[in-house]
Every structure is written in C-alpha cells, then in structure tokens.
A protein has these predicted regions:
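Metal- or metallocofactor-binding catalytic centers and their adjacent structured scaffolds
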Residues: 37-116
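Extended hydrophobic packing segments that form well-structured cores
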Residues: 364-389
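Conserved, mostly hydrophobic/aromatic
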Residues: 3, 41, 66, 105, ...
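A cross-domain feature marking catalytic cores of carbohydrate-active enzymes
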Residues: 48, 137-139, 171-173, 199-203, ...
Length: 389
C-alpha cells in the first residue's frame, strides 16, 4: 500500500468573541488537518498543532518537504518513514514546526494502519486499560476586559462548566500576578471548595512571579499549575516544584524523545503534558510516554485543535498504562475545549458528542470503535472552511 498524495487542509473561521491567554488575543480559530492517500484507496487523517499563520507554514512543510520524501513509500512503514523524514529535516530544526508537520503525517499513517488491520487505534497500540476516559473542560479564557469584568465572568463560567458535568476544569491566567490571584479566587468561589481545577499560565511568568502566584494559589488548592515559566527554563521548573505544594505541569512546548529526556531528567514536572499533534505524532508520543513512565511521571496529554485531535487522544489515553497501578489507580483525563469550536462540534461525519456524553456519563466519554481513529471529516465541511491566507 503506497503513499500517493498528502494534502494539508487549513481551516479557519471568525470567532464570535475574542479569546486569549497570557501570550496573545485571537479572533480567528484555525485548524490544520492532514490527509494521506494510498494506491489502495485507504485514506488516513491526522492533525498538526499550530494556530494562525503557523498552520500555513506547516502546510508548506507537509506538502513541499515531507510529501516528496515519502511519495511511493509503503504507508504501513510508519517507523521507517518517521526516521527518514526526521533525519532529513534534522539540520533544519529538531523542534517546532518540522515536528508539528511530521506529527500530522504520522497520525494519518497510524489511521491508515488501523483501517488496513480493521482495528481501532487503541488496539493497534496494545489495548485499552480503560473503556471510558474522564474529561476536564477548559475555558475561562482571557479577553481584553477590565479585571472586574474578568473576575465576574470567570466565576460565572467556572460554575457553568462544573454544571456541564466535567470531572474538573482549567482556567487561564496572565493579566499580572496580583490580578491573576483574584481570578483564581473567583474560580474557586464559583465551583465550591472541593471541585478540582487547574491553572494555566502559558509560560507567562518569571520564576519569581510564578513563585509569588503559586504560593498565593495554595490557599485555593488547585490541582496543578501549568506552564508557569518558559519551557526553556528547566531550572525554574525544578525550583518551583521544590518550593510549591501544587503540582507543576508542562511539556506541551517540548518536542521528540530527546527534548523530553532533558525535561524529565531535570525533575521539574509533577505531571507531564505531551502534545501528540506537535511532538512528532503517535510514533514519537509512545516513546515519550515510555520515557515519562520510566521517570514515574504521570501523564495528562495536552489537547488543542479539532475533533481529530480529540479522537487521537481518546485512543492514547485509553491505551495508557496505569502509573503506578493498584486497586484504585491514578487516572488520566482528556482535555476538552468548552469555547466556541466548529472544528470539534461540526467537523466529523458522526460527532464524538463529548458534551452530551460528559453530562450523561458522570464526566466520562466512550472510545471511538471504528478502525484507525474511528472518525472521518466531512468533505463538504473541509471545503467550506478551507482558507488560503
């Protein structure tokens, strides 16, 4: 079964309201879906991490760099393809966009392999350790509002996400240390004393400010403090983990096994958050997962993007071995975007229906059971939302 064509579908639409995090505001949602075709008529689907103009840069890498390398190769030779592409791109970047582009292609090749074997992805990996996956909802995004408006909205929105049935929720911070503490307090007030919530700084702090905010948030008992400092600041991560009671999480901005080896050896993480659509795809994710578990670091995948990314992560989380195991093992969670997202709600021929499942199944969702990823994008949807710039 030979690869005959690779197509990047960059999708976009204007959001009904501005969203943001510590690094930027944005008014347009984008997604980068990868389609790999074969000479036997089997098509695979994948996704590349990277918003906005990053998606167009990655499209160029997928179609102009990776495609010429792999055309005519056997689609089932995933590991051969991964290393051939990586080795030829290594001199031009071992992290970032080359890996994001490779991720989408690799995911699509796993989808093809599952379809060829007539097995769902989680079976291809080795089987499901759980038949349902717990889900947390993220929202409480920043907007260009004054702090009083943000406080009011965060309190209200957090209560709404809890009411939707999610097992936990995640909020953004990034408007300044003192005001961020006010936002954290508002969310705790909105959800009550015992509901689990997490705080995501998107590497917006210096180590000093992260320590200030981290100590202040301990009063409100968040479950983790995500990306408190820049991903390059391994010493900062290690210092914060040693000095704070809250779990320190991160890793969405790390790539491949070699980057993850350094991150894990620094001992700066309580919880690892690999991003399969960025770090090198499923092939590399499985190697990174093994590294995390060899360091006894629990994993909660970072998830951002379309329903393709959601489906991939459902399979990966189902197939994730328990760490450390036991009668009542620690359970990973699926990260789910509760904000306006056509690319989750409307992309597929058959919706994953995450929100309704969460509401009716005590905060959990079932696994896709079709071959490969078990999901298929609507061709008309791809055509409707495709953008060229």
């Amino acid at each position: 079964m030979k690869i005959t064509k690779i197509t990047s579908h960059v999708l976009g639409y204007d959001l009904p309201e501005t969203l943001g995090y510590s690094q930027q505001y944005y008014k347009k949602r984008t997604s980068h879906i990868v389609e790999v075709e074969t000479d036997e008529g089997v098509t695979g689907w994948g996704e590349c991490f990277g918003p906005g103009n990053i998606a167009f840069a990655n499209k160029g890498i997928v179609e102009k760099v990776i495609q010429p390398i792999v055309l005519g190769m056997q689609a089932l030779d995933r590991d051969v393809i991964w290393h051939k592409v990586y080795n030829l791109m290594r001199d031009h970047g071992q992290k970032g966009m080359p890996l994001q582009a490779l991720s989408g292609v690799d995911i699509a090749l796993w989808d093809i392999a599952g379809k060829a074997a007539n097995l769902p992805l989680y079976k291809m990996i080795g089987g499901a350790h759980r038949d349902k996956v717990e889900v947390y909802g993220y929202g409480m995004m920043l907007r260009p509002e004054n702090i009083n408006s943000l406080i009011s909205r965060f309190k209200e929105e957090s209560a709404e996400i809890k009411e939707m049935g999610f097992k936990a929720l995640k909020m953004k911070v990034g408007v300044g240390p003192k005001d961020d503490i006010k936002l954290i307090e508002a969310v705790r007030e909105g959800i009550g004393d015992s509901f689990r919530f997490m705080v995501d700084a998107n590497h917006g702090y210096t180590t000093h400010d992260a320590l200030y905010v981290g100590r202040a948030m301990e009063e409100f008992s968040p479950y983790w403090f995500e990306e408190p400092v820049a991903p390059e600041d391994l010493d900062g991560y290690r210092e914060l983990r040693a000095l704070l009671k809250v779990n320190i999480s991160g890793g969405e901005a790390e790539f491949n096994r070699w980057g993850w080896r350094k991150l894990l050896e620094s001992r700066g993480l309580d919880i690892a958050q690999p991003e399969v659509c960025a770090l090198g795809g499923i092939s590399e994710y499985l190697r990174v997962l093994a590294l995390c578990h060899s360091h006894f670091t629990p994993v909660v995948n970072h998830v951002w993007g379309s329903a393709i990314a959601v489906a991939v992560n459902l399979h990966l989380l189902a197939a994730m071995p328990p760490l450390p195991g036991g009668l009542f093992p620690w359970e990973p969670m699926l990260e789910f975007d509760t904000t306006h997202n056509h690319f989750i709600d409307d992309l597929l021929t058959v919706s994953l229906d995450i929100k309704n499942q969460v509401k009716s199944n005590n905060g959990t969702v079932s696994l896709p059971n079709g071959p490969g990823l078990g999901v298929t994008p609507q061709r008309d949807f791809l055509n409707k939302f495709r953008i060229d710039s």
